[in-house]
Swiss-Prot record:
<protein>
    <recommendedName>
        <fullName>Small ribosomal subunit protein uS17</fullName>
    </recommendedName>
</protein>
<dbReference type="GO" id="GO:0022627">
    <property type="term" value="C:cytosolic small ribosomal subunit"/>
</dbReference>
<dbReference type="InterPro" id="IPR000266">
    <property type="entry name" value="Ribosomal_uS17"/>
</dbReference>
<keyword id="KW-0687">Ribonucleoprotein</keyword>
<keyword id="KW-0699">rRNA-binding</keyword>
<dbReference type="Pfam" id="PF00366">
    <property type="entry name" value="Ribosomal_S17"/>
</dbReference>
<dbReference type="InterPro" id="IPR019984">
    <property type="entry name" value="Ribosomal_uS17_bact/chlr"/>
</dbReference>
<keyword id="KW-0689">Ribosomal protein</keyword>
<comment type="function">
    <text>One of the primary rRNA binding proteins, it binds specifically to the 5'-end of 16S ribosomal RNA.</text>
</comment>
<dbReference type="GO" id="GO:0003735">
    <property type="term" value="F:structural constituent of ribosome"/>
</dbReference>
<dbReference type="GO" id="GO:0019843">
    <property type="term" value="F:rRNA binding"/>
</dbReference>
<comment type="subunit">
    <text>Part of the 30S ribosomal subunit.</text>
</comment>
<keyword id="KW-0694">RNA-binding</keyword>
<dbReference type="InterPro" id="IPR012340">
    <property type="entry name" value="NA-bd_OB-fold"/>
</dbReference>
<comment type="similarity">
    <text>Belongs to the universal ribosomal protein uS17 family.</text>
</comment>
<dbReference type="GO" id="GO:0006412">
    <property type="term" value="P:translation"/>
</dbReference>
Length: 88
């Protein structure tokens, strides 16, 4: 039996927390059509992702991919930083 090739799930979002060591919290926003009224509404999900080098800061736009569970709530890993947050 040949092994089926798995597609790697990747998502893009904003870093909302970097207070943990080697972990970031990423906010994923998506637009969903309301089933009755038809209006598009924003829905969001917060995911914990592994950041090995502690390179992300709050406000960065990042790309993450699904991986094996690394902790109780962490099963995503940082792929790359797409856009750095503006320093104030």
């Amino acid at each position: 039996m040949a092994e089926a090739e798995k597609t790697v799930r990747t998502l893009t979002g904003r870093v909302v927390s970097d207070k943990m060591d080697k972990t970031i919290t990423v906010l994923i926003e998506r637009r969903v059509k309301h089933p009755i009224y038809g209006k598009y509404v924003k829905r969001s999900t917060k995911l914990h992702a592994h950041d090995e080098a502690n390179q992300c800061k709050i406000g960065d736009k990042v790309s993450i991919r699904e991986t094996r569970p690394l902790a109780k709530t962490k099963s995503w890993a940082l792929v790359e930083v797409l856009e750095r947050a503006v320093e104030v």
